């Protein structure tokens, strides 16, 4: 029996939608399987996505050459994706990275500054006085130093980027199947996907791109080897006037000596409810999940009170001029691979591949990561394109 499709992508998040677009641009017979965003998280019993949000930091500088290449190649295509889809998702407001000044035990700022020079990226290096003069709304610890990237950096809306990628995949001929995959198997010379809705779909090859939910016990013959952590993010509502006053605020990564108080923060962003929120994240410790059931239950919550209290304190220390705004929290998740890089490779079957384990830092790089996943299916391997890592996939015994 002939397969229903040439290639199926399982997962309609940032990586899956990107892979579907790149595949559909190059061949016919593409499908992407995954449910829509639930209307009510608290009562939803299915899977979730970490892209249900409006703010992720994007920047081109990274001390790691491979991560820098993934980011730069993705960012270079933002304008094309926005133009072709008609959906805007990128705000080039710049990105500021701060930490203890160079010369001490913490070398984070030094590594970022060196990476910027190596990559030829224009930056401003700011000491205490420079930080205060350029960003008066921030209050940093004495002895801080910052690397400011004014261009090619800022933030993206993951929700709108996924919408844009999905639209372009459909325009190129991909079929969107709004169902939830339960299992992927190599059967009789085909890759077969069975869904929770009771249907089966077959293809020459299948690419799994379901983020943290890829740890589901029966999804693959052997589950992927990665650690999945719950994260709590906190949102502070600001008025129109406050948002205007903070219009010069860049995306921020603040690194502290002991790392416990290290955070990331997004400037005021308008959310679907019409209000502006400043988002901050950076849990004080890890909350690991061993099963998909635990992960589903986590996404139905609003996160942890412990993390919220931690982030509220840091927010008021960093932005003292915003006086006790209303706030709320939400849950998210990140997945870490053994290698520290995305896993883009085949299972024991040459018909079933994975695109998972994005290490909490891949939203900005999702288009290039998705392209590499598409290349894996089309060419049978990732071609040598300047990456030092082989993006190898790991599986549990």
Residue ranges with predicted function:
Residues 21-25, 86-90, 200, 205, ...:
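Active-site substrate-recognition segment that forms the wall
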Residues 53-134, 262-263:
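Dinucleotide-binding Rossmann-like beta1-alpha1 core, especially the glycine-rich loop
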